[in-house]
Amino acid sequence: VTRRVLTTAWTLAWALLPVACAETSQERVQLALEVVGTEAAAPIEALDGVPVTLTRADLAFGPLYLCAGAQAGELCETARLEWLDTVVVDALSGTPQPAGELFGVSGVVQSWMYDLAISAQLTQEQPIVLDAAEALGGHSLVLEGTAVVSGITLPFRAEVPVQQTGATELGVPVVRKSTSDDFFHDVTGTEQALQVRFDPATWLAGVELRSYVQFETCGPEQTGVVCDGLVEWTCDPDGAHVSRDCSAASEVCIAGRGCAESVAIEPTSEAFRALRNALTSGARPEFVWVEGAE
């Protein structure tokens, strides 16, 4: 089922709603969608207790579909509620951010699915980069911050695109409620809003950052670059090793690279894979229904 098929099916269902409502007592529903981040009062922890302070955590979110059945994905032929737009979520802000309007019909919803602004369709060979991801340079997540490893403050940046892989159904949103997730709500139309709340601490919990800091000096006949804390060593097999203090240029020494302003978390790294897995199959965002005033 593609996003286009979902949308077409929903358009048809909307057109037939007067007839359907007479039979099922469903009503048209429109309510606000808000996205919310989490303000960290203290440094959060990456893998092995490494303290991390984030200065930026932008997530490209959407579209979002809420389904009647307990299992989302291709079993959700017609969404009960849907929001077809995208938004960049400031995941470090606890202030609700308006994202748009959810449209649909009343009734029970038991599952959800969403993309992170990179959407695959059966009719397209390549995933479509939607507005929010485009604003982040074609990525679903941009993280910036510092980690403290063995007393060394390590600036880092991660840019993570999240899109369909060969292991998922083509054309179906990439993040879906699992059978173990608790999600149930009877949509009545009295709701004021649905809030989707993200906590970036959950994305970093499995990210390994210690390996970027190294305490090593040149060995006999060794070549290449090694780091001894903040000191970069260029090793010479003849013993004419050359060192420089990275901190003198306000840089850090990154294992395997040498002096640099910050760590760029590469797509081939374990840290990158951990971030992507956290977004697709890790801790879920919290869905909070805000009831309207009586």
Where are the regions a protein language model picked out?
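Short, intrinsically disordered low-complexity segments
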Residues: 2-3, 243, 256, 275
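A short, solvent-exposed, low-complexity linear motif enriched for acidic/polar residues
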Residues: 22-219, 260-294
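Detector for methionine-enriched segments
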Residues: 11-14, 113
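Short, flexible active-site loop motifs that bind/organize anionic cofactors or intermediates
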Residues: 11, 54, 236
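Generic secretory/membrane-interface signal
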Residues: 5, 205-210, 228-230
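Cysteine-rich, disulfide-bonded extracellular modules and peptides in secreted proteins
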Residues: 218-260
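C-terminal motif of bacterial Sec signal peptides marking the signal peptidase cleavage site
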Residues: 17-20
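Bacterial N-terminal signal peptides that target proteins for export
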Residues: 1-12
